[in-house]
Each structure stands twice: as C-alpha cells, then as structure tokens.
C-alpha cells in the first residue's frame, strides 16, 4: 500500500470518529440537561420525559456508530488501497 494512502486513511479515520462524536456528545448533554429541567418542573411527567429522552439518545448515538463504521472501513477495508 502506498504510504501516502495509508497516512491519509489513518487521518481520515481519526477525523471521522472525532467529528462524528463531537456533535452527538454536545447534543446528548444538552438533551439530558433539558430533560432533567423538565422533570424538575413537572415530576408527574417523569416517565414520559424519560422514555422520550432515551429514544432521542439512541438516535443521537447512532450517528457516532456510523462514524465508527466509516473509520473501521477506512482502516481495515480501505477501498482506496490496491
């Protein structure tokens, strides 16, 4: 494999997982804070808020998993390597 392609693949994999985890990480923190604030304001709606929060967190985490899959493809099944 060309060393330039290998270096670029490692750099792209690092950027893919880093950037793919940055957005969902910030969004998960924000969503959790807002959910706790909502539960503090309306304790009787705790179950509904918690269910919605967990579903939202799962969708946000899927974006990070897609970044991980792209990084693994670039590292181990590189389509640009001959």
UniProtKB/Swiss-Prot annotation:
Complex formation: F-type ATPases have 2 components, F(1) - the catalytic core - and F(0) - the membrane proton channel. F(1) has five subunits: alpha(3), beta(3), gamma(1), delta(1), epsilon(1). F(0) has four main subunits: a(1), b(1), b'(1) and c(10-14). The alpha and beta chains form an alternating ring which encloses part of the gamma chain. F(1) is attached to F(0) by a central stalk formed by the gamma and epsilon chains, while a peripheral stalk is formed by the delta, b and b' chains.
UniProt name for this protein: ATP synthase subunit c
Activity regulation statement: Inhibited by dicyclohexylcarbodiimide.
Membrane topology: Multi-pass membrane protein
Keywords: ATP synthesis, CF(0), Hydrogen ion transport, Ion transport, Lipid-binding, Membrane, Thylakoid, Transmembrane, Transmembrane helix, Transport
InterPro entries xref list: ATP_synth_csu_bac/chlpt, ATP_synth_F0_csu, ATP_synth_F0_csu_DDCD_BS, ATP_synth_F0_csu_sf, ATPase_proteolipid_c-like_dom, F/V-ATP_Csub_sf
NCBIfam families tied to this protein: ATP_synt_c, PRK07354.1
Site label Reversibly protonated during proton transport, positions: 61
Function text: F(1)F(0) ATP synthase produces ATP from ADP in the presence of a proton or sodium gradient. F-type ATPases consist of two structural domains, F(1) containing the extramembraneous catalytic core and F(0) containing the membrane proton channel, linked together by a central stalk and a peripheral stalk. During catalysis, ATP synthesis in the catalytic domain of F(1) is coupled via a rotary mechanism of the central stalk subunits to proton translocation. Key component of the F(0) channel; it plays a direct role in translocation across the membrane. A homomeric c-ring of between 10-14 subunits forms the central stalk rotor element with the F(1) delta and epsilon subunits.
Residue stretches in coiled coil: none
Entry-linked PROSITE patterns: ATPASE_C
One Pfam family hit: ATP-synt_C
Transmembrane segments: 3-23, 57-77
Domain of life: Bacteria
Main location: membrane
GO molecular-function terms, A-Z: lipid binding; proton-transporting ATP synthase activity, rotational mechanism
Record flagged with keyword Thylakoid: yes
Xref: PANTHER family: ATP SYNTHASE LIPID-BINDING PROTEIN, MITOCHONDRIAL, ATPASE PROTEIN 9
Organism: Thermosynechococcus vestitus (strain NIES-2133 / IAM M-273 / BP-1)
